[in-house]
Amino acid sequence: MKTNVCKIALMFLIGTALSLLFNSCSKDPVIPENETDNKLHEDPSKMTIRLVECHLHADWNEIQKVGGPHQNPESPAKHMKRIQEITYELKAGKGWRLAEGSQSKFYVQKNGDYYTYGKYTPAPVYLMFIYYYNAKGDLMNSQFIENGQDNIHQHFFTPENVKPTFDGQPEADDNEPQKLVDYLYVDTTPWDKTKHSKEAEITGDSNPIGLKGVIRFLKDRKEFDLKIRLYHGYKSKGNPETRSEERR
């Protein structure tokens, strides 16, 4: 079985300082609020990333409109579980650390290129969910959505430190992210409902947040870190003054 190993690296970004640099070039610079003091949400104390192996019932390129990923049945393979989770906790004086008992890596497969009745249905693909918890242990995802917070929050996913597994070979384009992973935002409104249940619409294309996404892996025999950045801006994601490099 041709597999990849994916670890998670975390980064939380506040947009104010970055945007201050941008605004300093304008004739009449705007002085933003200190977003560190006025985030309008709690700081997370725990984060869980859940990866669910799926197959498709729709064209990959239509997922953000119609949905389509369906969970695969469980596998007896030791490392190839259909549902995998990695959990980090914020430790005093140490920052984000792997939670006790959490797995440290995701084991994933390169997708095969398949077509079903003319539709592009690569498999496997993986649904990726992110859950945040406050210091009390309460789920706090809604705090990044409600009261307009969805307009200034977005996750970004970047593979880094790519290297071959013990049985793989380095390739010239290993460090080109688009050659390694393909990610689509499939956030929903409401955020905690699904299109399959007919209780929500998929809005990840128009309002990408990254609490829900679908990812596929384009190479095999690779090991890498998936850097996850949660960006908190002081202006809407759709504002042209938002720094483009932070939206990649």
PLM region descriptions:
Residues K2-V5, L18-I49:
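Bacterial Sec-dependent N-terminal signal peptides
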Residues T36-A92:
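N-terminal leader/pro-regions and domain N-caps
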Residues K78-K119:
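N-terminal edge beta-strand
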Residues A123-M128:
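Short beta-strand segments enriched for Tyr within beta-sheet-rich domains
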Residues A135-N141, G233-E241:
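Short acidic/polar inter-strand loop motif in beta-rich domains
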Residues D138-H196:
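Extended, polar beta-sheet/loop recognition surfaces of beta-rich domains
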Residues S197-R221, G233:
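Short, hydrophobic beta-strand segments
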Residues E246-R247:
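Conserved small/polar residues in nucleotide/adenosyl-binding loops
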